[in-house]
Structure formats: C-alpha cells, structure tokens
Amino acid sequence: MAAMDADIAPFDTARTDHGLMDRAVEQARAAVGLPVGTRIVAAMSGGVDSTVTAALLAKAGYDVVGVTLQLYDHGAAITKKGACCAGQDILDARMAAERIGIPHYVLDYESRFKEQVIEEFADAYLRGETPIPCVRCNQTVKFRDLLDVARDLGAEAMATGHYVQRSFAAGANRPQLRRAADPAKDQSYFLFATTAEQLDFLRFPLGGMDKPTVRLVAAELGLAIADKPDSQDICFVPEGKYTTVIDRIRPHGALPGDLVHMDGRVLGRHEGVTRYTIGQRRGLNIAVGDPLFVVKIDADKRQVIVGPREALLTQALSLKEGNWLGVEDSLEAAAAAGAPVLARVRSTREPVPGRLTLVPGPNGGEPRLVFDGLEEGVAPGQACVLYDPADPERVLGGGFIVATERAGL
C-alpha cells in the first residue's frame, strides 16, 4: 500500500496553503468513500484535472497507481495545443506521477481507439449524423477497457478528473451520477452512458470543486502542469478540421450530391455530406434571398436539405443505445411508463422539459422523447441526456439521437 501523505517527499509542503490543501484532501477522501490505504487507479491524461486527482488521492493516503492510455499518435494531432493522450501529454503524465511518487503505466490503446472511436466518428458523418466522440471514448475505451485494467491491478476503485459528482441518496444502495458543483465545467452530458456497474467502481474527486481551485491546488503542489491549457474540441482532430480525419480514414467515402431546398428545388451541388451538420448556415455557397440552414442530411440520396431557420424546430426525437440510472430497469421501461424528464441535446444548452414515450417494436421498442416546447437544431448522432425534473442535478441517463420529428417538416 502507498505511504501516507507525510511520506510523499516530492511535495513542497513549506509552500503549501494548508487550509486549501486540507479542504481539497478531505473532499477527495469524501468522494472516494473508502478506507485510507485502499488501492485506487488514477486515470492520468497529462492534464491538470487528472494530475490533481492523482496527487490529492496520494496525499489523502491512498495506494495510487497512475495509468495513461496512448490513444493516437498521428501527424499534427500529436502537437495540437489542448490535445490529450498522445505525445507531450504522456510525458507530462509520467513526470507528474514521478513527482507525486506513484507508479505509472502507459498502455497502448491506439488500435482500439481507432476502431471504436475514430472509425465510428468517420462512419457516423458518412451516415449523415453529427457524432459525439467524447461520449464514445468514455463509454468504451475509458470506462470499459480501463476499468478492466484497474481491476487487474487490484484496485478497489478508479478515479478520473471529470467534473461530475457521485453520491448516495438517503437509504439507497447504489450511487447517483450528478452534475458538477461548477456549472461551467460540468461534464455530465459526456458521461450519460456510464452504467450503474461502472458508477459503483468510479470516483470523481474534483466534482465538488471549480477549475480555479483545482489550478490553485496544482500550483500549491508545485506541479508543472498547473497552467497547462484545458483540452479543447475533439482531441484527435488537428486544428478542428474534422473532415481531414474523415478523408484519411474513409478516403472514398464522401461523394458529391445536390443541395436541395425543402420545397424540392435543387439549389446547387456539394462535395460530400460529411461537410455539413444540422443547423449549419456558413459554407453553403448558394445565393438566395433569405438565410438558409441545413435542416436534414439524406446520406443515401447524397442530399443536403436546406430551409429557413424555423424548419430546425424539433418537437420529438427517437433514441438508441439507451442507458438508464433511474429507478426503472431500463430506458425502455421508463419510456413505457411515460416518465417526465429534463432533456439536454447539446452540452452547451440547459435541459428542457419533456416526456418519454415508447414506440412498440422489436427488442422492447424504441424510446421516444416529446419536448414540452420546441427545441432548435437537434441532430441525429448527438446525445440526448436526461435529468430528473424532481432533482435537476441528477443524471437519469440518455441515449443517442437516431431520428427527429421537425415541427416544420
């Protein structure tokens, strides 16, 4: 087992704000909820959040093992500012683990990440969807494969630097997933697919902190990454140009087609449906009187359908690959019961009220969400994350949007 915090020599305790540090350590202990000395794997990406997570757990007296996944290593993505899990970030994680005084392992998951995240990302665009690879990464590589590694290492829990909270309601025997204390950093949207079994094993020590506090803790500990920029956008997409990745992974996938007005008029040509997303206005290169937006993508017909902004208004959507953390057994069961929910269709938006219904069909039917009002620019492929209207901080689950019902179509 790891030594207690008094034995972690690399930390410069003389320069530490003990009030801040004591609060942070106690918060980490509370988030873990396991006896001091328990082995915990800390997922370390090389960023500020995961590094502080590992450091706080070590100071709290846990037996911490740092694990970093090498997920990709191609071209400009390696040196992209704000990337993670490649190149310099792996070196940063290794150096941080050495300073903290914990063992550190780097695991090569490049081929698995390529297959489960990058290729799925490209294929989703070819299907006319707008994918959300961060959810796929958490759902597969990080919260499935890495949890298996943690168990193989003899850990009782795995901690990450995500900004979400895990807590128990009175009398409950299973934890809830809840939004972070800092709304600006809340990552619950990206973790909706976390299963109840995974949540039993996971810990999120930073969920009750804000980012300025985390950076202060990093600075007090003398960690070199205290001022390192946050990761931005999609980690494996160089300079935000996602079409570069698609063209490399599926070089002959995107074929030209027609830009079609929703009234049936052909307005021009496009270079491939992968260049467009629902709600897009720029880059259409068509000259008409009123502003037009992408309202639908028909990949089978190679058509990008455009219309006025009001055509983006959505009254309902269908979900696939659902995950459910509520009292019902599944998302389908909650939908069959007509459960009221708060629904969030983009990470940058607040949840809005709606109600689940179930469309009869194979495999238990298809969950459907009907909004109380109208929601703009809902895109197939994105996540729809569901929260409890009686307790809006609680994540109930969600699914991936497979189809939408437009008010204007």
UniProtKB/Swiss-Prot annotation:
SUPFAM superfamilies: Adenine nucleotide alpha hydrolases-like. Keywords: ATP-binding, Cytoplasm, Disulfide bond, Nucleotide-binding, RNA-binding, Transferase, tRNA processing, tRNA-binding. ATP binds at A43, M44, S45, G46, G47, V48, D49, S50, L69, G161. One of its GO terms (biological process) is tRNA wobble position uridine thiolation. The active site is at C137 (nucleophile), C235 (cysteine persulfide intermediate). One of its GO terms (molecular function) is tRNA-uridine 2-sulfurtransferase activity. CDD domains: MnmA_TRMU-like (cd01998). Residues 185-187 are annotated as: Interaction with tRNA. It comes from the Bacteria. Catalyzes the 2-thiolation of uridine at the wobble position (U34) of tRNA, leading to the formation of s(2)U34. HAMAP family: tRNA_thiouridyl_MnmA (MF_00144). It is found in: Cytoplasm. This is tRNA-specific 2-thiouridylase MnmA. Belongs to the MnmA/TRMU family. Its main location: cytoplasm. It catalyses: S-sulfanyl-L-cysteinyl-[protein] + uridine(34) in tRNA + AH2 + ATP = 2-thiouridine(34) in tRNA + L-cysteinyl-[protein] + A + AMP + diphosphate + H(+). One of its GO terms (cellular component) is cytoplasm.
